[in-house]
């Protein structure tokens, strides 16, 4: 089923992180670099531990911490703040395409998908292209080791999807992954139930995997 355009949902936060880290790498910006976030950027009625902690107030936060919120906690507001920092969703799409990844599309932010849930179908990838991107990010020198190591450490700390890729694996298996899922609509259909990442087995064997399920009932 690799020809299907699977909606990524929050898996696209991995693509966003790559573009952000590329900008930081090119401009030699440290992970502890502080960015100012306005209270108006912390949208209500969306999943956001960041907003729960800082509701109604401006804040200054390190870029590295914003990335942790977006990847490990799948914070939607943190993701959109990072999209803006990276230059917009169109720039992120072009960055990923320049890496040689073709069977995907990114055109929507978390806010635009929240306003019109059908737009979530516009952010899509094939499973094999997602695996290619994961492998490339792990094996190629896309940016300095300090950024690369931070990304994979953050992915191993993902708090969502303990019943997905990690499900029945031995407890000492290392899994660096990004999940993505939707609620079921009124007809009981779930747009997406996804998990993609790198798995390092206790014996040291490594593999990359993307599991995408769409429109399940």
Locate each region found by the language model.
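Flexible glycine/proline-enriched surface loops and loop-helix/loop-strand junctions
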Residues: 2, 62-66, 73-79, 110-118, ...
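Short, well-structured active-site flanking segments
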Residues: 22-45, 89, 144-148
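Extracytoplasmic
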Residues: 3, 9-11, 15, 30-32, ...
